[in-house]
Design a protein with these regions (language model features):
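Inter-helical loop and helix-membrane interface segments of multi-pass membrane transporters/permeases
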Residues: 1-2, 15-71, 100-124, 191-195, ...
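Hydrophobic alpha-helical transmembrane segments
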Residues: 52-57, 213-214, 247-255
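Membrane-interface helix-loop-helix modules in multi-pass membrane proteins
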Residues: 1-36, 143, 160-181
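Membrane-water interface regions at transmembrane-helix termini and the short interhelical loops
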Residues: 1-10, 57-81, 143-151, 236-241
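Membrane-embedded helix-loop-helix hairpins and adjacent transmembrane boundary segments
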Residues: 209, 251, 258-270
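Membrane-embedded translocation segments of transport machinery
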Residues: 75, 79-224, 228, 241-242, ...
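Transmembrane-helix boundary/entry motifs in multi-pass membrane transporters
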Residues: 1-11, 28-32, 39-52, 79, ...
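Generic alpha-helical transmembrane segments of integral inner-membrane proteins
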Residues: 56-64, 86-90, 167-174, 255, ...
Length: 270
């Protein structure tokens, strides 16, 4: 059905991006950002065969977590990492807004351009944000909802998810977009902005090496917790339809997603 296909399609795309995050976490540990041109570093990686091993690693981590049943451990770690991410965001926000020309980015975010409301692409991008950010693609929420305890206040939980999702997105926008203006980057570049703007900010701040590691580690936990949802939902649908085992369903879905995403690996950010 459509919700299942949509969550699988998201899983296909998301695996590529999680691979990028793993690569940048590794690069932040090595301190690569301090010795290279950051934009060229990204362009030499994204859209090339170099992404394949990181994408493969992302898929292996995801299926291992699902099959070994260590999701509870990820949830417990997220109770630490997600608040830590908000603290890191706050520090980065303060540093970003003190960069030269950053206020132009703030104006870009806050001054409305009403004519864009009449352009279909605006609504498509807004739906895409909801689609990815809040997982409003049906199946994932249904599968996770089936695991809830009977006494969970679902409307209140949903409200909290929406609020914290919106707050984190707004914080990220006020870090990345002003940062893009400060370093002369195109604010409409899309997902690649995270991987170009943030290393620039880390280079320009005290203890940037440490904050870079913590930032990308937090993003890994956020990304893994999301992609687990996508695999769980897709594998659950496969199990129900083909009456097979959890292991087989998870393996087939993961393998199919990786293979389908190879053209994305070789073309994204190009």
């Amino acid at each position: 059905n459509i919700p299942t296909l949509s969550v699988f399609g998201t899983f296909v795309f998301y695996g590529v991006v999680v691979g990028w995050v793993l690569k940048y976490f590794y690069a932040s540990i090595k301190g690569d950002f301090y010795n290279v041109d950051i934009a060229n570093y990204f362009n030499s990686f994204a859209g090339t065969s170099a992404t394949l091993k990181w994408h493969f690693l992302a898929m292996v981590i995801t299926i291992v977590i699902v099959l070994l049943g260590v999701i509870k451990g990820i949830e417990r770690m997220n109770k630490i990492m997600m608040p830590a991410l908000f603290v890191i965001f706050t520090v980065l926000l303060i540093r970003t807004l003190t960069l030269p020309n950053a206020m132009e980015g703030v104006k870009y975010l806050l001054i409305p351009r009403w004519e864009y409301l009449f352009k279909p692409i605006t609504w498509v991008m807004a739906l895409g944000q909801a689609f990815f950010s809040a997982s409003l693609n049906g199946a994932g929420m249904v599968v996770y909802g089936s695991y809830l305890k009977k006494d969970v206040d679902i409307p209140n939980a949903a409200l909290q998810v929406a609020i914290f999702d919106a707050v984190s997105a707004i914080l990220a926008a006020f870090i990345i977009i002003p940062g893009a203006f400060a370093f002369g980057l195109d604010p409409t570049s899309g997902p690649s902005l995270l991987f170009i703007t943030m290393p620039h900010i880390f280079k320009a701040m005290p203890f940037g090496y440490l904050f870079g590691i913590l930032f990308f580690l937090s993003i890994i936990f956020a990304a893994i917790s999301s992609i687990i949802n996508m695999l769980e939902a897709s594998a659950d649908a496969y199990m129900s339809f083909f009456k097979t085992t959890r292991f087989k369903a998870s393996f087939i879905v993961t393998a199919a997603a990786f293979i389908i995403a190879i053209p994305l690996d070789l073309s994204m950010a190009r």
